[in-house]
């Protein structure tokens, strides 16, 4: 009997597979982008690998800068060139301005009530205006200058105590960004609280998980069996409990504070923006700031120091610039940064080679549209491979894979959404509204690190290729912590 069941199941699988390939062959249309062959049920999911940005870049080299894949039942456009990204994020920006639904995002971010993940519409416009006009203005960014200076000074003191020893730069930079963002958004630091650190680790891991049910709904039971559903529920509840306590403490505390929670509560209380902001929206926006602001800035600084340590000639040139401008000063102030052109070039080059989100948060088309000769139906997801665009030889030349900050010194290309060959923060309506906040922290941190100390890699890491290996997840960090030998210049 068992043998007969196996034969029947095998025959059924073979029959479905044959039907799939017949349908795929007959259904191929000339007005759709090129597509790699796909498997029944899962489509092209098997081709993503551990590092989807690299796998998709390899596929685009074969099938072109605009590919149509299927992740389970979901059609997904993969964009791997600046020209096509311009079409998506500028020419047809409104059509592609929405976000696809995701169980992970909805469970964690209050049914996508935040700014980064909310579907395009009136609610999203209202929440974005709150962020742009009240939380992330140039005035607000400047107002937290002392916070940045204080936390950088504390980091430098930690380094001073480790002189001539190996320093874990990854740990230091992670703590710095966590402390700065926590003080700005939540009003105080949480780096000494084990529960908070563990919660952030769980959250970061979950955001990089693959949710089967999102792409193959009738296989959603796999997410339950794998434990993903349980992890989402627990982490979502723990985050809400934490954020609720933060908001409650602010309501009961000093009304004169000006961190982000206080600003949002004041807007809610005074009804000063012309629409209601409820408690869930406040918590979702704060979660956006904490998650997005901490991980991305930390990753960029970690990769910048990685590249500089592996290229001492670049590090020496940066040190020469910073030390010349700040000669006689014990530290670098934010006012000094404006004249540091090579520093800005180093940061641009890091963003080009190591965008913190190599695959940008997916977009989704809200109506049918034509991209060149291709018909793109409503409901199509779009994945823009910022990592591949930053390494496109047609744009950056034959040395596109090489870290060479000099390429930016006489270039007008910037990362603020106007030049589509460099889009680490996105572009168009969905561009990250916190660019200025992130960049000033990155600039002043790197400048102080190279101004006060000399750095070199430990001998055992110089030729070790695993020392530049990537982690997995939504935000790409180093696979292993970055260690460096430090010595004071004084």
From Swiss-Prot:
Keywords: Heme, Iron, Membrane, Metal-binding, Monooxygenase, Oxidoreductase, Transmembrane, Transmembrane helix
Protein localization: Membrane
Matches recorded under Gene3D superfamilies: Cytochrome P450
InterPro entries referenced in this protein's UniProt entry, alphabetically: Cyt_P450, Cyt_P450_CS, Cyt_P450_E_grp-I, Cyt_P450_sf
GO cellular component entries: membrane
Binding site for heme: 432
Assigned EC number: 1.14.-.-
Chief localization: membrane
Molecular functions per Gene Ontology: heme binding; iron ion binding; monooxygenase activity; oxidoreductase activity, acting on paired donors, with incorporation or reduction of molecular oxygen
Cofactor(s) for this UniProt protein: heme
Top-level EC class: oxidoreductase
Membrane topology: Single-pass membrane protein
SUPFAM superfamilies associated with the record: Cytochrome P450 (SSF48264)
Pfam assignment, any one: p450
TM helices/strands, residue ranges: 2-22
PANTHER family in alphabetical order: CYTOCHROME P450 71A2-LIKE, CYTOCHROME P450 FAMILY 71 PROTEIN
Family: Belongs to the cytochrome P450 family.
Record-given protein name: Cytochrome P450 71A22
Organism encoding this protein: Arabidopsis thaliana
């Amino acid at each position: 009997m068992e043998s007969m069941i196996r034969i029947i199941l095998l025959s059924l699988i073979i029959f479905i597979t044959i039907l799939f390939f017949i349908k795929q062959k007959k259904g191929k249309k000339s007005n759709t982008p090129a597509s790699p062959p796909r498997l029944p049920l899962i489509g092209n999911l098997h081709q993503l690998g551990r590092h989807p940005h690299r796998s998709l870049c390899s596929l685009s080299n074969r099938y072109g800068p605009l590919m149509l894949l299927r992740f389970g039942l979901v059609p997904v456009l993969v964009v791997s060139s600046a020209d096509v990204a311009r079409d998506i994020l500028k020419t047809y920006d409104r059509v592609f301005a929405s976000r696809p639904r995701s169980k992970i995002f909805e469970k964690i971010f209050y049914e996508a009530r935040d700014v980064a993940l909310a579907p395009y519409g009136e609610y999203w416009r209202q929440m974005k205006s709150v962020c742009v006009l009240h939380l992330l203005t140039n005035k607000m960014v400047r107002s937290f200058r002392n916070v940045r200076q204080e936390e950088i000074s504390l980091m430098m003191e930690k380094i001073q105590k480790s002189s001539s020893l190996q320093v874990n730069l990854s740990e230091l930079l992670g703590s710095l960004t966590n402390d700065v963002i926590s003080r700005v958004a939540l009003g105080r630091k949480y780096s000494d609280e084990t529960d908070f650190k563990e919660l952030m680790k769980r959250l970061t891991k979950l955001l990089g998980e693959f949710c089967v049910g999102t792409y193959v709904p009738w296989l959603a039971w796999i997410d339950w069996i794998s434990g993903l559903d349980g992890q989402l529920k627990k982490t979502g509840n723990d985050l809400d409990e934490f954020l609720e306590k933060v908001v409650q403490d602010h309501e009961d505390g000093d009304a004169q504070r000006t961190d982000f929670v206080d600003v949002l509560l004041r807007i809610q209380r005074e009804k000063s923006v012309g629409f209601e902001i409820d408690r869930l929206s406040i918590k979702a926006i704060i979660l956006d700031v904490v998650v997005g602001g901490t991980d991305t800035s930390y990753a960029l600084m970690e990769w910048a120091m990685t590249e500089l340590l592996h290229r001492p000639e670049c590090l020496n040139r940066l040190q020469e610039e910073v030390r010349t401008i700040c000669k006689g000063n014990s530290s670098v102030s934010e006012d000094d940064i404006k004249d540091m052109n090579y520093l800005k070039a180093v940061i641009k080059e890091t963003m080009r080679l190591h965008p913190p989100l190599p695959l940008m948060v997916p977009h989704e088309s809200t109506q049918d549209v034509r991209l060149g000769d291709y018909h793109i139906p409503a409901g199509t997801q779009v994945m823009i491979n910022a990592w591949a665009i930053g390494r496109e030889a047609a744009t950056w030349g034959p040395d596109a894979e090489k870290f060479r900050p000099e390429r930016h010194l006489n270039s007008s290309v910037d990362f603020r959404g106007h030049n589509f060959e460099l889009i680490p923060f996105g572009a168009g309506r969905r561009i990250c509204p916190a660019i200025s906040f992130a960049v000033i922290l990155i600039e002043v941190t790197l400048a102080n690190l190279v101004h006060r100390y000399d750095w070199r890699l430990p001998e055992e890491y110089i030729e070790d290729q695993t020392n530049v290996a990537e982690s997995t997840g939504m935000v790409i960090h180093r696979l292993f912590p970055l260690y460096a030998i430090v010595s004071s210049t004084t």
